[in-house]
Amino acid sequence: MSIILIGFMGAGKSTVAKLLAEEFTDLDKLIEEEIEMPIATFFELFGEADFRKIENEVFELAVQKDIIIATGGGIIENPKNLNVLDRASRVVFLTADFDTLWKRISMDWQNVRPLAQDKEAAQLLFEKRMKDYSLVADLTIDVTDKSPEQIAELIREKWEIE
């Protein structure tokens, strides 16, 4: 059975997934393989609506495997994805206050985040998404003062993962 990590940009989903399993799936990487370009480029060329459609198709295939999945922060934007998450039995919501996440996003030069170019817009997006993250989560972890290793250990303990 899959463990699906959800949360806003900068929450540490990919980092924690790497600690939980050597073989994990970063949904953004699968999407980039499918579209054959960086997500930021796809957003620029085709827009968010087309991206969310492809994201859903790739996500529905990924959850059928027994793997750790680090999702993109906007996975909950598509109602179809909410249904998939609602049916999944191990969904972990990594959360923190907006200022903590914004600081992390601002310091991350490796990832281009099309929806995080403006702080005010990002904060509105954060506020909009928080409720949906909470609704589908089986486990919520506030990551503010925790290391990725501590977060991974909490998840392992919850589901007795080696």
Curated annotation (Swiss-Prot):
Binding site for Mg(2+): S14
A Pfam family: SKI
GO cellular component, one term: cytosol
Subcellular location: Cytoplasm
Cofactor note: Binds 1 Mg(2+) ion per subunit.
Binding locations of ATP: G10, A11, G12, K13, S14, T15, R113
UniProt entry tagged with the keyword Thylakoid: no
Enzyme nomenclature, EC number: 2.7.1.71
Recorded GO MF terms: ATP binding; magnesium ion binding; shikimate kinase activity
Catalytic activity: shikimate + ATP = 3-phosphoshikimate + ADP + H(+)
Top-level lineage group: Bacteria
GO BP: amino acid biosynthetic process; aromatic amino acid family biosynthetic process; chorismate biosynthetic process
Biological or metabolic pathway of the protein: Metabolic intermediate biosynthesis; chorismate biosynthesis; chorismate from D-erythrose 4-phosphate and phosphoenolpyruvate: step 5/7
UniProtKB keywords: Amino-acid biosynthesis, Aromatic amino acid biosynthesis, ATP-binding, Cytoplasm, Kinase, Magnesium, Metal-binding, Nucleotide-binding, Transferase
UniProt KW Cell membrane keyword: no
Annotated substrate binding sites: D28, R52, G73, R129
Cofactor(s) in the UniProt record: Mg(2+)
InterPro entries: P-loop_NTPase, Shikimate/glucono_kinase, Shikimate_kinase/TSH1, Shikimate_kinase_CS
HAMAP family, per database record: Shikimate_kinase
Entry similarity comment: Belongs to the shikimate kinase family.
Oligomer status and interactors: Monomer.
UniProt function note: Catalyzes the specific phosphorylation of the 3-hydroxyl group of shikimic acid using ATP as a cosubstrate.
UniProt protein name: Shikimate kinase
Organism: Lactococcus lactis subsp. cremoris (strain SK11)
Underlying gene: aroK
